Every structure is written in C-alpha cells, then in structure tokens.
Amino acid sequence: MAQQGKILKEQKYDRQLRLWGDHGQEALESAHVCLINATATGTEILKNLVLPGIGSFTIIDGNQVSGEDVGNNFFLQKCSIGKNRAQAAMEFLQELNSDVSGSFVEESPENLLDNDPSFFCRFTIVVATQLLESTLLRLADVLWNSQIPLLICRTYGLVGYMRIIIKEHPVIESHPDNALEDLRLDKPFPELREHFQSYDLDHMEKKDHSHTPWIVIIAKYLAQWYSETNGRIPKSYKEKEDFRELIRQGILKNENGAPEDEENFEEAIKNVNTALNTTQIPSSIEDIFNDDRCINITKQTPSFWILARALKEFVAKEGQGNLPVRGTIPDMIADSNKYIKLQNVYREKAKKDAAAVGNHVAKLLQSCGQAPESISEKELKLLCSNSAFLRVVRCRSLAEEYGLHTVNKDEIISSMDNPDNEIVLYLMLRAVDRFHKQHGRYPGVSNYQVEEDIGKLKSCLTGFLQEYGLSVMVKDDYVHEFCRYGAAEPHTVAAFLGGAAAQEVIKIITKQFVIFNNTYIYSGMSQTSATFQL
C-alpha cells in the first residue's frame, strides 16, 4: 500500500521531481509557509505552492471579505462576503491539493507583533503581501533576528515588487545554465590517462574506430598535439581550428581515398571548444573558501560550512589544487561497452574523491564537537557533484535599506542614469508609502481625489529624495500614473507576481537554484523587470 502511494505521488509530481528531485520534494513537503494577508497577490502565491505539494500553510488576516476582494481575487466568491478573508481563502486553496494542510489565524499581523512576535518564528518562511511600511519594518526585524526568511510581495497598479530578506542562504544545487562538463582532458588523473592509453586508433577495426567515444578521440589527438607544441593546449581560435583539422585527418578513408562517415569524429570536432576548457577553481568557490565562516569552524557552524571547509582541505591535499571529479559524462556516439568503461573511470574517481572529502568532514565534526551523523552521505555526495557551483547569497536587512546612513545610494543613482529604469518604480512605491503615512490613505483611491493627490504625491516624492540625499529626477508622468493606480491590485499583475514569488519560495525551501538578491521590480507598463541590491 505504501509503495502504491509512492508511485501515485511520483506520477502526480512527475514534472517537478525532474527539476528538484526526491530530496527537493521532501523539503517542500516538510515546509510550513506563513502568508500574511489573503490578497489577490497572496492567494496567487499560495496557489503556486499548494499545487506542487507544500507541506502546510497558515494564512494570517484579520479582514473580512468585501465586494472589492471578490472583484479582484479569483479565490474569493460572492458567498464569501462577510466571512474572514483568511478562512475563505484557505478553504478554496485547500481544494487544489488534498496532500496539503491549511490553517488560518483571524487576527491582524499588527496585533500578533504586539502580543506574540515569536509566533512568526515557527514557520519555514513568511510571505507578506500588501503590508504597511511600519508593519513591514517591525516584522522584518523580528524575523531577521530569528533567521527566518521573509519575502515581501506587493502589487500596486501595473507594478510588481518583491524583496527577499535572508541573512545567509547557501546553495549546493544551483543548477547553472550551460554548465561545462568536468572531463579533465587538460589534467587527466592517472586512471583516466591509463584508460586513454589502452586505445590505439591507428590499429583498430573500422567498427571499433567509428564507435570510440569522442572524449577518447580528443584525448588521443591532444597527446599528439602536445608532442608537436611543447605541451601547450590549443587556446586561440587558430590553434583550435588547427586541432580540429588534426582530428579530421584521423577519419578513416575508403578505397577511393574519401573520408568515411564517422559521426564520433564529427562529434569530437564539434566539442573541441567545450572539451578543452581549463580545469580550475571558479572565483566564486575561492570566495567561499576565504569566507570567515569557512575558516572559523565551531560547534554552531552549519553543515554547509563544514562541507565547504572539508572541500577546501581536499583541494589543498588529495585534489592537488583541483575540486573533486564530478563523475558524469554526456551522451555520445559509442558502443555500450566502451561508453560504460569510460563512464566507470569517471564514476570511480568521483567516489574516491567523495570518500576523501568525507574523511575531512569526519575530522572536522570531531574537532568542533559535532555529532558524526550530523552530515549524511547524501549531503556529501551532493556537495562533491556540485562543488564547482556552490553559491552563498547574503541579503541586506530591511532596516539597512531604509536607514538614512545605510541606504544603497550608489545602486539607485547609477540606475537612474536612465530616467525610465525600473528603479523609478521603487522610488514611487516609497513615495506612496510616505503619502499613506501622512494622509492615512493611498493617493487616488477615489476618482475625485486623483487630481488633487498629484501635487501631494509629488511633494512626498521630493521629501523622500531630499531626506535620503538622492539627487535624481523623476518624471511627472510617473507621479500621475501612480495617482491613477489608486493602490489597485489588478489580478493579472498579481497572478504574474504570484508565479514569480512562489518560484523564489521554492528555491529557498529546497535550497536549489539561486534566489535574486535582493529586490525585484516588474513593470506591467513596459513588460520588463529588473533586480537591484538595495
């Protein structure tokens, strides 16, 4: 029965399991997400978390469902009017996936912060939507000190805004686009060199010759190239073209002297550029090795930094300046026997390297007084196979962003070289928050107020820019546009932002793929978006 349930789950979540694997899905299913305010944006985010099977969610909202809510929120209906908004949204969202557990709290976030701020620290991540600036600052401070990730989301007219607040977010499985294969052709390890030497391309039957893996072909002709160039690897365009020609000359000829159709040699020629990449440690990994968290290991050091330190020790000793072998090779034209033999050479070396890193992990855990079982074999293997792609994201706190002396002026001013850069929308959002603080409402919420609010909003914008010492000019068109928005939350923009926000939440929970750092702005006017470090 349990096996049948597992098969059904694999079928249900088939596509996403291919993205983040069983361990990513397990992390998702054990997560508890808190949503503050069941707005259109908030329910769209939860929809995109409930469908892939988030473990549980809690909605905090003290408001009752209004006609306006029903008009712009797909997850609220006429029959919901007058009910608590958190409860109504929870009931509809739970219908999407029976595997997910939902709950609600009929209270405002302000009251919870006043009476029980630690309430927010029980969640895996908190997502806050459409909150006032003063409430956000209080919430962000509580979560920052408790090291709970916070994602702020906001839809304002045709503008979408997200801000991630997380002290430190290490990523082992960053899944980089277009990652190069780890073939070590420029620095073959002894077992690989021995394997290459077992091939003699000059004395092979035609069938064997045309089914030799292209990795072997490049390695054999690289040895020939070295003998003619004093061991210098082809680097320039001309050198690589000459090397391709050298391989091309190795294609067998028929009785008429015409080249045979050997696809494996064509594959080798096509892969020259990527196969001859230099084996080296990326600068981002060097930065991790030189980080204080990697150098100073204590009993409180998280597993990621123990693993990073063990990796550093391996590079200095067994790796002889290199990271562990990844242990994978791409598909290629070759007979099964030759391919499997080559694959096993890389796999065995990867296992050997992982075992060496594991020995360093064991010593480090013992030296700092942590339990030997605190780092699993699975974590160790994941680290070794992704050692070239490790990432650490550190976001600034909201207090730093809003501080007069810690605001990132350079990022804002340099971005405003283009007066229509998306950063102008951030400045306008800060201005409307200032407007709300002064007038107790957002500009243009009533049609008759739009014209009179233009001057007031412009005054708020000027005051904000002067207070923060931002010598930039904002076009009047943006002031007019934000007054016309009237703080509306169009469902089309909320739906787009909901998808983007859920993606970042999943990245944080699974610790896979790389989150943005730290602000994302979407413009529905120009259909563009940008990220900023604010």
From Swiss-Prot:
Gene3D superfamilies: NAD(P)-binding Rossmann-like Domain. Signal peptide: none annotated. Heterodimer of UBA3 and NAE1. The complex binds NEDD8 and UBE2M. Binds APP and TP53BP2. Regulatory subunit of the dimeric UBA3-NAE1 E1 enzyme. E1 activates NEDD8 by first adenylating its C-terminal glycine residue with ATP, thereafter linking this residue to the side chain of the catalytic cysteine, yielding a NEDD8-UBA3 thioester and free AMP. E1 finally transfers NEDD8 to the catalytic cysteine of UBE2M. Necessary for cell cycle progression through the S-M checkpoint. Overexpression of NAE1 causes apoptosis through deregulation of NEDD8 conjugation. The modification N6-acetyllysine is found at residues 6, 341. Residues 331-344 are annotated as: Interaction with UBA3. One of its GO terms (biological process) is regulation of apoptotic process. This is NEDD8-activating enzyme E1 regulatory subunit. Ubiquitinated by TRIP12, leading to its degradation by the proteasome. The keyword Acetylation applies. InterPro entries: APP-BP1, ThiF/MoeB/HesA, ThiF_NAD_FAD-bd, Ubiquitin-activating_enz. GO terms for molecular function: NEDD8 activating enzyme activity; protein heterodimerization activity; ubiquitin protein ligase binding. Expressed throughout the brain. In hippocampus, strongly expressed in granule cells and in the pyramidal cell layer. Strongly expressed in the piriform cortex. In the cerebellum, expressed only in Purkinje cells. Pathway: Protein modification; protein neddylation. The gene is Nae1. It is found in: Cell membrane. The record marks 211 as: Interaction with UBA3. Keywords: Acetylation, Apoptosis, Cell cycle, Cell membrane, Membrane, Ubl conjugation, Ubl conjugation pathway. The modification N-acetylalanine is found at residue 2. It comes from Rattus norvegicus (Rat). Belongs to the ubiquitin-activating E1 family. ULA1 subfamily. GO terms for cellular component: early endosome; glutamatergic synapse; plasma membrane; protein-containing complex.
